[in-house]
Design a protein with these regions (language model features):
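A hydrophobic, helix-centered structural microdomain
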Residues: 1-52, 159-177
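Short, glycine-rich, amphipathic interfacial segments at transmembrane boundaries or analogous
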Residues: 28-66, 124-143
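Short acidic-aromatic low-complexity motifs
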Residues: 75-85
């Protein structure tokens, strides 16, 4: 219900983003295999923020020059995440949970497996995101994800959503080299 409502609520934002995003990269949506609940892979959907052909690596390892001008705005405002509401509708993700990692982030996958993080669906936002922790420190990220799982209740669920909407957190870092 929340993801459908979110799609309807943010539809007026989605249309201009689709238009401007297509100008910057010619491809509107970005699809990538990620690790979901119980380590089951799924296809995550986002607005494209990087140039087509950019290697499929974690954002903190990507070059800043690979991010389109529109992509910088989408990342800063977190609007690039809106298409993931479709993943939520399909039951592959939740609004709140650990961010789904790439299939090649072996260290993070192992850390999360050890701490039981894969027991729940990944989310669009979570504790690590509002604290500004990205995937560049797999052990810290997995520990914060595990802590979120032990403290996740209805109040915190909506608190994380609210803080994300208010711009808390830095989003994924990119390599400035």
């Amino acid at each position: 219900f929340f993801s459908f409502s979110g799609l309807m609520l943010f539809f007026p934002l989605l249309l201009p983003v689709l238009v401007f995003d297509s100008i910057g990269s010619r491809t509107l949506l970005f699809k990538q295999e990620r690790i979901g609940r119980n380590q089951k892979p799924f296809i995550l959907i986002k607005f494209r923020t990087m140039l087509p052909g950019t290697p499929s690596i974690a954002s903190h390892l990507s070059s800043a020059s690979a991010v389109t001008s529109v992509g910088k705005i989408l990342r800063r405002t977190k609007l690039d995440e809106l298409p993931q509401l479709w993943n939520v509708l399909k039951g592959e993700m939740s609004l709140v949970g650990p961010r789904p990692c790439l299939t090649n982030q072996n260290e993070l996958i192992q850390e999360r497996e050890t701490l039981g993080v894969y027991d729940i669906r990944p989310g669009i936002t979570g504790l690590a995101q509002i604290q500004g922790i990205d995937m560049s420190n797999p052990q810290l990220l997995a520990e914060v994800d595990a802590r979120m799982l032990t403290t996740l209740n209805l109040k915190n669920y909506f608190r994380y959503i609210f803080l994300t909407l208010m711009g808390k957190g830095l989003g994924d870092k990119i390599n400035l080299n």
